[in-house]
From Swiss-Prot:
Subunit structure: Alpha-beta TR is a heterodimer composed of an alpha and beta chain; disulfide-linked. The alpha-beta TR is associated with the transmembrane signaling CD3 coreceptor proteins to form the TR-CD3 (TcR or TCR). The assembly of alpha-beta TR heterodimers with CD3 occurs in the endoplasmic reticulum where a single alpha-beta TR heterodimer associates with one CD3D-CD3E heterodimer, one CD3G-CD3E heterodimer and one CD247 homodimer forming a stable octameric structure. CD3D-CD3E and CD3G-CD3E heterodimers preferentially associate with TR alpha and TR beta chains, respectively.
Annotated glycan sites: N42, N89
Location(s) in or outside the cell: Cell membrane
GO biological process: adaptive immune response; response to bacterium
InterPro entries: Ig-like_dom, Ig-like_dom_sf, Ig-like_fold, Ig_V-set, TCR_alpha_variable
Domain of life of the organism encoding this protein: Eukaryota
A single cellular component GO annotation: T cell receptor complex
Signal peptide residue numbers: 1-19
SS bond partners: C41-C107
Protein's name in the database: T cell receptor alpha variable 25
Amino acid sequence: MLLITSMLVLWMQLSQVNGQQVMQIPQYQHVQEGEDFTTYCNSSTTLSNIQWYKQRPGGHPVFLIQLVKSGEVKKQKRLTFQFGEAKKNSSLHITATQTTDVGTYFCAG
């Protein structure tokens, strides 16, 4: 019996908006299909809001969500977004990754 596993490559990008540097950690990550994945955005200053985007290979960035409130948590199916209490960081968690999750994820503040 042949077992085939898919390797997902999820990229993150560094963003700079209005002079604020927002850094994502890790910058890229290989994930096996079915594994969970988490990436973080950290800002040097307090953000009034943060947006998350996804760009599929060869495609344009697609808006996913905007977080405004301190400590806010929002879910979209297998994706969970969180805005830190101090409004200087955010996280994106994908549960049980699928091949449709392949792409570049980035945040902007």
